[in-house]
């Protein structure tokens, strides 16, 4: 049984779950490469407003969608790239755009899969700050292998080794956890850090 905001979501279609307040990004960037930054965001907004292919509904929602897309563009720091095709953005900018599309519908729970995979250290640092800003007031659940990213983003961390949760706590407590140290650093390092020989 999976509960979101007091309602069961298991068995629901992805678009229904999205409209209930959960959105996600993929490990592989999932945007429209031949649309501009603004158009990608507007598509996300229109979809969240229930627009599919009804022309009259599209017209009635266009002003609101344009305004929301503009706000999102500023939030993800791509307002200077408004008319740039997504395919011409840097990889980090494409990931930022995907985050914008992910939150376009106002989701209060955001799932991210390896959000910084493939980024340079400086891009990763900037992206961590961006994620923190745009997910403020939302629940963020991320799967991430870069422990620097995990410790930079998380209030709580679950460490999973071979399918078993070996720790679930604050970053400081997880960092000090002997089982976590052994799993990620090896027992000799964990013993040395604990004062062993």
Q: Which residues fall in each region the model found?
A:
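Glycine-rich phosphate-binding loops of nucleotide-dependent enzymes
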Residues: 1-197
């Amino acid at each position: 049984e999976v509960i979101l905001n007091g309602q069961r979501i298991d068995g629901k279609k992805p678009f229904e779950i999205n409209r209930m307040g959960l959105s996600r990004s993929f490990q592989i960037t999932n945007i429209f490469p031949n649309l501009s930054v603004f158009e990608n965001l507007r598509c996300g907004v229109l979809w969240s407003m229930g627009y599919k292919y009804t022309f009259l509904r599209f017209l009635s929602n266009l002003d609101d969608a344009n305004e929301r897309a503009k706000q999102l563009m500023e939030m993800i720091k791509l307002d200077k790239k408004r008319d740039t095709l997504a395919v011409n953005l840097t990889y980090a900018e494409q990931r930022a755009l995907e985050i914008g599309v992910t939150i376009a519908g106002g989701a209060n729970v955001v799932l991210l899969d390896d959000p910084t995979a493939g980024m340079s250290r400086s891009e990763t640092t900037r992206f961590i700050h961006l994620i923190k800003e745009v997910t403020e007031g939302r629940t963020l659940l991320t799967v991430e292998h870069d422990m620097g990213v995990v410790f930079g983003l998380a209030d709580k961390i679950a460490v999973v080794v071979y399918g078993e949760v070996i720790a679930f706590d604050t970053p400081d407590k997880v960092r000090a956890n002997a089982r976590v140290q052994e799993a990620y650093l090896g027992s000799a390092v964990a013993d040395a850090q604990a004062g062993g020989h």
